[in-house]
């Protein structure tokens, strides 16, 4: 599904645009082209397109969402997305006044960004880009189409933008952390003597998924081995298990580590745990 590119009234900008304007001014940036999933999600108030949640590739190219934001000009903001995102807008309208859900790959997305910059008179502006998240073919198109523009690495500016969390973001981080902790404790209770690392990791994945988190990874050790990769190694009585896992909750990562022992801990382990407790309570 696609909708005709159009312009809507600015309403409910989902971030502190005055602060973003200040950060852009300090970085010498006139207009942003945000292309990473985490920064486009932030600038769109938490939105991400579920179709490309797990994989960006499509055909011979890839998904490239672009948020265009002009310093001091939110009425010139635009979102450039995939053709299928027109339906997303119909159900939950994007805040950006300009919307172009007309892309399948990187080049058509970059071309629409160039066209929009021309319409708002920013062909020769200082344009902030994300070099690590801008495919080379899209970069080359932008560079060729805008020879008078100055392309600036906006990575640090965007990191500073997201550094101060809102109350809503902190709540998501809290929920993400609690979901991961609860999943780990449930997995440790589930595991038995003979449970392999691969089986334990798969159980943790199920626990996190059932609680509403998107499983990212699990690094697991058993006994004296420091190898954290999945394997047929089985948990033995008296061995310590260390689970380090990250799970995604609406774009925010809960990343924690918990430990358990199969059976009763020995005296040495009790002493070590007491030392850890003493440090934590100090």
Where do the PLM segments sit?
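Active-site neighborhoods and metal-handling regions in enzymes and metal-associated proteins
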Residues: 1-282
């Amino acid at each position: 599904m696609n909708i005709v590119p159009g312009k809507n009234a600015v309403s409910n900008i989902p971030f502190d645009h005055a602060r973003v304007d200040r950060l852009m001014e300090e970085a010498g940036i006139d207009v942003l082209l945000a292309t990473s999933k985490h920064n486009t999600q932030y600038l769109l108030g938490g939105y991400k397109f579920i179709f490309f949640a797990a994989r960006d590739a499509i055909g011979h190219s890839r998904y490239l969402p672009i948020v265009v934001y002009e310093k001091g000009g939110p009425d010139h903001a635009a979102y450039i997305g995939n053709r299928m995102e027109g339906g997303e807008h119909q159900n939950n309208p994007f805040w950006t006044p300009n919307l172009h859900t007309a892309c399948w790959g990187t080049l058509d997305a970059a071309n629409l960004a160039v066209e929009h910059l021309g319409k708002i008179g920013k062909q020769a502006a200082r344009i902030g880009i994300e070099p690590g998240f801008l495919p080379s073919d899209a970069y080359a198109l932008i560079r060729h189409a805008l020879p008078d523009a100055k392309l600036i690495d906006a990575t640090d500016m965007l990191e500073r933008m997201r550094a101060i969390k809102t109350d809503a973001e902190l709540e998501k981080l809290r929920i993400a952390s609690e979901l991961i902790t609860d999943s780990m404790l449930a997995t440790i209770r589930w595991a038995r003597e003979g449970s392999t690392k691969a089986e334990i990791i798969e159980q943790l994945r199920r626990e996190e998924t059932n609680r509403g988190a998107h499983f990212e990874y699990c690094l697991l050790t058993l006994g004296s081995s420091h190898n954290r990769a999945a394997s047929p190694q089985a948990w033995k009585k008296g061995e310590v298990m260390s689970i380090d896992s990250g799970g995604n909750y609406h774009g925010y990562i809960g990343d924690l580590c918990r430990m358990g022992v199969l059976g009763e801990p020995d005296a040495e382990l009790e002493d070590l745990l007491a030392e850890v407790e003493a440090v934590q309570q100090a």
